[in-house]
A protein has these predicted regions:
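N-terminal polybasic/positive-inside topogenic patches
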Residues: 4-16, 28-45
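Surface-exposed interfaces of beta-sheet-rich extracellular modules
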Residues: 738-752
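Accessory carbohydrate-recognition regions in carbohydrate-active enzymes
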Residues: 61-396, 400-443, 449-509, 517, ...
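Surface-exposed, charge/polar-rich loops and edge strands
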Residues: 24
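Sec-dependent N-terminal signal peptides
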Residues: 46-50
Length: 782
């Protein structure tokens, strides 16, 4: 990259951190507008005027969506308290591979924490969450002085002041080695650039981690190949990540590592913990590494390396930037408040990382994938690293609305997962993982099919078979896949709390909603009513857990008696990472039925009000007295018993719409966006969870939210952003405009026609329309 281009690129990237009046004017992305002219202040001399003109014109360059993204949002997290539990993922949207700076030790789920001071490498990662941990791992670290491999000995001090994190690029100055390390990715490959000092001893450490790894050095071809097997579960026998690394400088030093022993001039090692160290001539200042990985074979890894072509580092970086702008730019947002745009696009970035692609392109140009379910290579798409308990709620609805082309591939991938394992995944990383409850793959499939995501006849038949099978079976080794307790649910209409199945009320409520989703799929596919009517009836099973005396959901024994004693503030037990006040609202598909059970609109809204009015009290006895981080996050956020940091309650605010008090939804939505989200390292109020908590913000900032995935309906909230355009396939656009101050919606028009309902439909949006909100600081009569 030429100096002028690099300087301009730097200016564009850093403008968002400058105070007004020096910040850029907040307008549409540069790709859609010409650069604006700049007026000068009154001149105090020709030289000063010219200087002001140059400086001011430079700062008036329109920013593009990716410039607002802060990949460090949510990284100031720990085991005890989550501010997102994210890492700065340097990747393409839905890319198979991601890269991240590694501050944690090998095997540590907290691979990068903002409060750390030492860096151990640039890590190839596939980790969706610290709780699920990683697989397919590789760490690369440039060092100086003497060859070192130990992760602590090679580590270096670093500072955030000398760190540059973007979705498509990462750079850091490694102080102990006086080296600047950079990485920029493609879908399955990446380039690194190391700037070494004049001091002697320039090395790159390649660490594929322990629990079975292999390396081979080819000095003549300046190449290191190998594999890593370290994983955290969800893989078949023989699982490997194959990698290839090619350098642009001669290898003056070669050594392999076998279980921490460095063996100079040895070109191959296979061990529990193998590795490699390559060195370069002392006069070498700049080293480039071209890296690719594959889950299929070493030959496929070499093929994946061709994604880089003959491009330079800067060309790959520029292409990555363009790709992110293209995908982020599907939602073109403008606002007077730069912080709103930073938070919005940082959340949208998070919503576009998972589920990650798990497919590759073979020598014939065909889409193929290694199956983490049966260990074979198959044709077709596959995606992974998502937990449907989290992401069915708003992430997949966001993809279905704005990125239906990706949703189509994901739907085909789900059909393949069923063919290869006999079950739809509920938590995949990369294969079935035993985590969370529910059968929420049904919601993911339903929202896609009901909202018109194309699916082949063969895949549609496969998905219907998968849904109906999973509703009446449980995976033989992974209890969270299928339906644990399905026999009780089918016979009693609920999972009892006294039959040795934990979190039974949560399971029942989610199974009831999932039954409704299955019925929606059957109806949409045009299947005979006899095939899906029973699921529509059993969707009412939520009623069996409603206790009219407390107006809350409650665990029930097999003999029909209520679970006693009953503490509605007790987390866990009959519920999953929440209490009765959180789970009572998990009737996504029938809010009117729940309103009737509670005694009508006023009583229902009073119960909603109580969630915020209650103190943040809790009972953590289910966890042995340990206050899990989800509890702590609720306790400290200052919103009573509302626990936005975890998923079960995130739709609750929008339920005011169903009971005729939308002004309360509008108020609380703005309070959550204002108080619980920021584009900073502590920017989330709990686990981000693979795009779900971010997708909540994206939808809410637009002014509507999918309370019930699979319904084709959105509850109206109150937009945060002043001017947004959703660019949908086929050239269709949804334009969302808001004027006025305050959170309350005084009026809404759609295509200049008054809209008096509290809801929008997917059909209205996908055909294109203009929404105009007029906002006021005082509530309008409901």
């Amino acid at each position: 990259m030429a100096f002028g281009h690099r300087a301009l690129h730097y200016v564009q990237h850093t403008l968002c951190y400058l105070p007004e009046p020096f910040g850029v004017a907040l307008r549409a992305p540069a790709r859609s507008r010409a650069l604006r002219g700049c007026a000068l202040q009154k001149k105090r001399g020709l030289a000063l005027g010219l200087a002001l003109c140059i400086a001011h014109c430079a700062l008036c360059i329109d920013k593009e969506p990716v410039d607002y993204v802060n990949p460090l949002m949510g990284t100031m997290s720990s085991y005890e308290l989550s501010a997102g539990n994210t890492y700065p993922a340097v990747a393409m949207p839905w890319g198979m591979n991601a890269w991240t700076p590694q501050t944690g030790k090998m095997g540590d789920g907290w691979t990068y924490t903002y409060t750390a001071h030492h860096l151990r490498g640039l890590k190839l990662t596939h980790q969706p969450s610290p709780w699920i941990n990683d697989y397919g791992q590789l760490s690369i670290m440039p060092i100086t002085g003497q060859p070192r491999f130990d992760q602590d000995e090679r580590a270096s001090w670093f500072s955030h002041k000398a760190e540059d994190a973007r979705p498509y690029y990462y750079s850091v100055y490694l102080a102990d080695h006086d080296v600047t390390a950079e990485v920029t990715p493609t879908e399955r490959a990446a380039m690194m650039r190391f700037s070494f000092p004049q001091a002697a001893g320039h090395y790159v450490v390649i660490d594929p981690f322990d629990k079975g790894s292999q390396v081979t050095i080819d000095r003549e071809q300046r190449r290191v190949t190998g594999y890593s097997t370290r994983n955290s579960g969800g893989v078949p026998e023989g699982f490997k990540l194959w990698f290839v690394i090619e350098f642009d400088q001669p290898l003056a030093y070669c050594a392999t590592v076998s279980d921490c022993s460095i063996v100079p001039s040895c070109m191959e090692a296979t061990a529990s913990h193998a590795g490699a160290i390559v060195g370069f001539a002392d006069n070498t200042r700049l080293v480039h590494a071209r890296i690719a990985a594959s889950f299929i074979s070493p030959e496929q890894a070499l093929l994946n390396l061709q994604e880089l072509g003959s491009r330079t580092f800067d060309q790959v970086m520029s292409a990555g930037r363009d790709r992110w702008n293209d995908v982020l730019g599907r939602i073109e947002a403008q606002d007077d408040d730069r912080d709103h745009l930073r938070t919005f696009y940082s959340c949208l970035y998070r919503a576009l990382l998972f589920p990650r692609s798990f497919y590759e392109i073979d020598p014939q140009g065909q889409v193929v994938h290694y199956s983490p379910y049966d260990g074979q290579v198959h044709e077709g798409y596959l995606f992974t690293d998502t937990g449907f308990w989290d992401t069915f709620r708003s992430l997949f609805p966001l993809l279905n609305l704005v990125y239906p082309d990706q949703s189509q591939k994901m739907l085909a991938g789900l059909a393949n997962a069923y063919r290869e394992s006999g079950f739809l995944p509920e938590w995949a990383s990369p294969g079935h993982r035993d985590c969370m409850v529910g059968n929420n793959s049904a919601a993911v499939v339903a929202d896609a099919i009901v909202n018109g995501i194309p699916v082949s006849d063969d895949d549609a038949a496969t998905l219907w078979q998968a849904l109906t099978h999973g509703a009446h079976a449980v995976h033989p080794t992974v209890r969270s896949t299928g339906r644990l307790g399905w026999q009780y649910y089918d016979s009693l209409g609920y999972v009892p709390c006294d039959v040795g199945i934990n979190e039974s009320a949560a399971r029942t409520l989610e199974y009831a909603y999932d039954d409704w989703c299955i019925a929606q799929v059957g109806r949409t596919l045009g299947l005979p009513t006899s095939q899906w009517a029973a699921y529509e009836r059993s969707a009412q099973n939520y009623r069996k857990l409603f206790d009219p005396t407390t107006r809350l959901m409650r665990g029930r024994k097999a003999n029909g008696e209520w679970q006693t004693p009953f503490n509605p503030l007790k987390w866990g037990g009959d519920f999953t990472e929440g209490n009765a006040w959180h789970y009572t609202w998990s009737v996504f598909h029938d809010p009117q039925g729940l309103i009737e059970l509670m005694g009508g609109n006023e009583a229902f809204c009073a119960m909603l009000d109580s969630v915020f009015a209650l103190p943040p009290a809790f009972d953590a006895s289910y966890y042995g007295g340990t206050v899990i981080h989800e509890i702590r996050e609720m306790q400290i956020m200052g919103m009573g018993n509302y626990a936005h940091g975890n998923q079960p309650i995130q739709h609750m605010i929008y339920l005011y719409d169903y009971a005729g008090q939308p002004r309360k939804a509008q108020y609380w939505v703005h309070e959550v966006m204002r108080r619980l989200y920021q584009a900073t390292p502590d920017g989330y109020c709990g686990d981000e969870d693979n795009g779900q908590t971010s997708a909540w913000y994206v939808f809410s900032a637009l002014g509507f939210y999918p309370v019930c995935p699979g319904s084709g309906e959105y509850a109206i909230g109150s937009p945060l952003l002043r001017d947004v355009t959703l660019h949908l396939p086929g050239g269709r656009r949804v334009c969302i405009q808001a004027s006025g101050d305050g959170p309350y919606v005084h009026s809404l028009t759609i295509d200049d026609q008054p809209h008096r309902s509290n809801f929008l439909t997917h059909r209205q949006l996908r055909t294109g329309c203009t929404l105009y909100y007029r906002l006021t600081p005082e509530p309008h009569a409901d």
